[in-house]
Amino acid sequence: MELILGSQSSARANLLKEHGIKFEQKALYFDEESLKTTDPREFVYLACKGKLEKAKELLANNCVIVVADSVVSVDNRMQRKAQSKREALEFLKRQNGNEIEVLTCSALISPKLEWLDLSVFRARLKAFDPSEIEKYLESGLWQESAGCVRLEDFHRPYIKSSSKNLSVGLGLNVEGLLGALKLGAKIASL
């Protein structure tokens, strides 16, 4: 059965590739601006549910569709994708030397199974090097990530301690997804 990743995220695509999961990547448009909540957990859940509803429109093809959404929370204040370099700098200032949470809601839908998971990756950060912040902002890489958090490069050397579920921090609960895929295969074979 074909697996479709309903996301344009290169980090999510890389996670699937690293785990040997074959997939096709397709963008699903869901208007996150229509969500009025400022609660990080509620927001990421509703955004993922919205994407899941869009995915249901593609299900006629007898395929498995995976969607996800992530936000960052610092002191329970939500950080989505920064809209400007100034906002990115504000996000990084708030994260500097503090604990961050990356909340990721991952979901899978197939003709016989629907799975949804909300997980949290926590990291305590050291203080950022101001010259590295400037380089990071100039690179533009921050534009791709919720809260400008890039655990795969910029944030990595600043992690003092963290929870074990790095894939959640990178935007997709791969461990949970693998379990759901195995369950889906068992159900399909019945």
UniProtKB/Swiss-Prot annotation:
It comes from the Bacteria. Its EC number is 3.6.1.9. Its cofactor is a divalent metal cation. One of its GO terms (cellular component) is cytoplasm. It is found in: Cytoplasm. Gene3D superfamilies: 3.90.950.10. The active site is at residue 69. It is an enzyme of class 3 (hydrolase). This is Nucleoside triphosphate pyrophosphatase. It comes from Helicobacter pylori (strain P12). The lineage of its organism: Bacteria, Pseudomonadati, Campylobacterota, Epsilonproteobacteria, Campylobacterales.
